[in-house]
Amino acid sequence: MERAEKREFVTELNEVFKASGSVVVAHYAGATVAQMNDFRSKMRAAGGTVKVAKNRLAKIALQGTEAEGITDLFKGQTLIAYSTDPITAPKVVMDFAKTNDKIVVLGGAMGTTTLNADAVKSLATLPSLDELRAKLLGMIQTPATRIAGVVAAPASQLARVFAAYAKKDEAA
């Protein structure tokens, strides 16, 4: 890579770090090309991205971003997984790491918060933003459904009482 290319790559990576909701750093030593391609496609399908960058360039790109605290994680063969949704990148990385022992999570960042491997793991267990919205909408709709049922119940019970009186009068 020439100097101009490196500058452009660092600028690009800096913008990525600034725009990301979360960043996960992991070792990938020993992973095959097929495994990495599979990992990249799963991350892309979930709305995230995986990049492999030189550690020195990644450290330079981190300067001036909220995720600057993770510079110490860049040692050895590291990859960067990121997404705009704070939950997507950790979730996909942890799911892939369960089935592939070559991917070892080192840590990450979510905004200004630096995360260790355990924090990334616990972040991965949280529901995504869309799932939270669906749950909230369900919680909001449930009381309305119950109120409609309570309001409709007396009318239907009243109709049953009238029907019973009508049958009683017919029988008499």
UniProtKB/Swiss-Prot annotation:
Record carries keyword Ribosomal protein: yes
Coiled-coil stretches: none
Keywords, ordered alphabetically: Ribonucleoprotein, Ribosomal protein, RNA-binding, rRNA-binding
SUPFAM superfamilies per record: Ribosomal protein L10-like
Gene Ontology molecular function: large ribosomal subunit rRNA binding
Organism domain of life: Bacteria
InterPro entries in alphabetical order: Ribosomal_uL10, Ribosomal_uL10-like_sf, Ribosomal_uL10_bac, Ribosomal_uL10_bac_type
Gene Ontology biological process terms, A to Z: translation
Pfam families linked: Ribosomal_L10 (PF00466)
GO cellular component labels: ribonucleoprotein complex; ribosome
Family in the record: Belongs to the universal ribosomal protein uL10 family.
UniProt function note: Forms part of the ribosomal stalk, playing a central role in the interaction of the ribosome with GTP-bound translation factors.
Quaternary organization: Part of the ribosomal stalk of the 50S ribosomal subunit. The N-terminus interacts with L11 and the large rRNA to form the base of the stalk. The C-terminus forms an elongated spine to which L12 dimers bind in a sequential fashion forming a multimeric L10(L12)X complex.
Protein name: Large ribosomal subunit protein uL10
